[in-house]
């Protein structure tokens, strides 16, 4: 091969490489952390109050035993349910897209299920009426658009909340005993304690955070915690009347 031919071959190779799309190099994902814990109730648990649903026989017949209020629900081992736990400080400068999966608020037995719902701002909320009777769902926000919608059985209803707000009281204008709460966040780092008081904040970026626990009757508590990359830590809150 002559020098001229060799130069032509090298030029052709370089030209073909220059026409290739650039290779994208992805940096390895940062190891995330988790924060698990439990919320406890100190002292003798308050007795739940029986709900009188006699004004709507369709509501009353949905329960084999009398329905009770859910403002303070204490489970096994004094675990406190329906507490919202969330990152209230430490995420400055970060933005998060809402999940594609909608949150679901069900009206069942003429009560809101779950009693306390948490979702992300601009995440779709599917409101479901599983009862034979007609409901009127009416959130009363301070930082979001108020809406007040009559919903017969089976009629689909989709809503969203645009801004963070903890927490929005929800009532039903038809059934005055129906009460619940919706907590709206601008990030995905929140949880609602289960029937045993347990919660799990997953996939936290490493950092130092203020963690807040909110309960509708017992108020709020805060703690500060630092988690490293890939680290798992535990946290406990205790409420009392």
Regions found by a protein language model. Give the residues of each.
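Extracytoplasmic copper-binding redox domains, predominantly the cupredoxin/blue-copper superfamily
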Residues: 25-241
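Positively charged n-region of N-terminal signal peptides that target proteins for export
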Residues: 1-5
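Bacterial N-terminal signal peptides
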Residues: 6-20
